[in-house]
Amino acid sequence: MSAQPVDIQIFGRSLRVNCPPDQRDALNQAADDLNQRLQDLKERTRVTNTEQLVFIAALNISYELAQEKAKTRDYAASMEQRIRMLQQTIEQALLEQGRITEKTNQNFE
């Protein structure tokens, strides 16, 4: 699908961006989220300069993204460790099962 121009409003300013039709809702949601963040930031910080607010919001979003990436890395490492432990447990159980089967076969001979 080719991108099509979409008009969005960010903090009172019109912005035209190209967006694939199937991502239009996500773009509008992102714009709404950014508008809310900017409004909240303006109220909390009393900063009135829009450019400063945008930079502060961008830094906050970048920080949040870095935190989420770190969480994802930690989770992936934890899952890899659990998978290795499960593999070892399964391998050990299979070895034990093989020994039991071997002993049972020897007893019947």
From Swiss-Prot:
It comes from the Bacteria. GO terms for cellular component: cell division site; cell septum; cytosol; plasma membrane. GO terms for molecular function: identical protein binding. Its main location: cytoplasm. It is found in: Cytoplasm. Keywords: Cell cycle, Cell division, Coiled coil, Cytoplasm, Septation. PANTHER family: CELL DIVISION PROTEIN ZAPA. NCBIfam families: PRK10972.1. Activator of cell division through the inhibition of FtsZ GTPase activity, therefore promoting FtsZ assembly into bundles of protofilaments necessary for the formation of the division Z ring. It is recruited early at mid-cell but it is not essential for cell division. Belongs to the ZapA family. Type 1 subfamily. Homodimer. Interacts with FtsZ. This is Cell division protein ZapA. It comes from Escherichia coli (strain K12). The lineage of its organism: Bacteria, Pseudomonadati, Pseudomonadota, Gammaproteobacteria, Enterobacterales.
